[in-house]
């Protein structure tokens, strides 16, 4: 199978890097107790950027490797060390590349060297526990996870940036003409559809330098997909002028140059968007006797239509100087009317769901679905293996008003609550805490609903239970034995009791006091 050398349309799957995770760490140093949290933040993931490179003329590289991924961000570390930034992935594309989504919606038109489009943003790094510390939460035992980077499919379509476009039937001599007026060396042969890909040539006429595109041959029905023209008509959309190259030497029975020009014009009209471009007509191959005669028959009719007609020969060079200077005049006028293109940087940002702070709650057969930029981002940042992190999420959702909204809409304890899009939603059981308007007595970052399962709470509860069991099993004799004192014969208990000051029951009484 032949390997393509020119590709002007590809579907590219791009993935930005994931942000690094924050870390929960406590400062430890000799003679410095209670050093406090020192967990660093995760680094942001790398982004995917398309950049116009004048040295790139095809999308062939992305045809062979259609999946591209940027680097992930590094994780945070102790001692306030932040994770490394993921390296951005820069993909060079030809000048004139159009970027769209798989549904055909235009995202950007990249024109001008250095123009950039950030198609996929890297994920933000998670915060370490040092950044989460506050007056009420002095030593968080958790950190936030890094967010995933953007991942999407885009369609790259090349529309050659040329000043002049050559159009005509197959074997009209377009490739020979561009080879004669420039240093381009396209494939030339005496059979139709020799040219299978557009050829670009740089032409100089006086002080003006411009580019000419040789489009593969058009036939009737090209705008509907016949022949090769349908795939390459896009390459003349940016041209300042269109030159009809008409073969005057090898006319088939029933055909003439005027009819050929009308067929091509009809296809350009049906393709659309080219009606306002100036037209030039190059009657080619006049070096052949029959060609010169036929050109003489049709030149007046074409000029009566208001067309500028040139009798040329790509083989001998006849008429090429006049043709190229006419092209240069049109190009100069078009450039003067068009502002200069400066390199720009475009960033694609997916639209937020109902604004950055807003959220929606919808009843579904599966439960209650919550959508919103903040709730969905908070869920992605949460480490669900850490109870304190889950409590922090519950606190944030409560403060945002999610629990209050669910209660107002009739949600009951135990109902399923789904946060996020249907494909990646996280499911919770609705367990309402305190009212959102009431004061939250637990520390921020902790949740009373999870307090009993925390390790510190379990240890405290075990000690309390052991002390209670021991107290119940001790008798007064056990207490006396533990205190190394004999049990009182009267059965009285050791410990606080009433007594007369100076009497024998006074704990400060001594035998020497009797002598006084």
UniProtKB/Swiss-Prot annotation:
It is found in: Cytoplasm. Residues 466-516 are annotated as: Disordered. Residues 466-491 have a biased composition (Basic and acidic residues). It comes from the Bacteria. Residues 351-432 form the OCT domain. Its cofactor is Mg(2+). It holds the Pfam family MMR_HSR1. One of its GO terms (biological process) is ribosome biogenesis. It is an enzyme of class 3 (hydrolase). Residues 162-332 form the OBG-type G domain. Its EC number is 3.6.5.-. Mg(2+) binds at residues 175, 195. Keywords: Cytoplasm, GTP-binding, Hydrolase, Magnesium, Metal-binding, Nucleotide-binding. CDD domains: Obg. InterPro entries: G_OBG, GTP-bd, GTP-bd_Obg/CgtA, GTP-bd_prot_GTP1/OBG_C_sf, GTP1-OBG_CS, GTP1_OBG_dom, GTP1_OBG_dom_sf, OBG_GTPase. GTP binds at residues 168-175, 193-197, 214-217, 284-287, 313-315. Residues 4-161 form the Obg domain. Its main location: cytoplasm. GO terms for molecular function: GTP binding; GTPase activity; magnesium ion binding. One of its GO terms (cellular component) is cytoplasm. PROSITE patterns: G_OBG, GTP1_OBG, OBG, OCT. Belongs to the TRAFAC class OBG-HflX-like GTPase superfamily. OBG GTPase family. An essential GTPase which binds GTP, GDP and possibly (p)ppGpp with moderate affinity, with high nucleotide exchange rates and a fairly low GTP hydrolysis rate. Plays a role in control of the cell cycle, stress response, ribosome biogenesis and in those bacteria that undergo differentiation, in morphogenesis control. Monomer. This is GTPase Obg. It comes from Nocardioides sp. (strain ATCC BAA-499 / JS614).
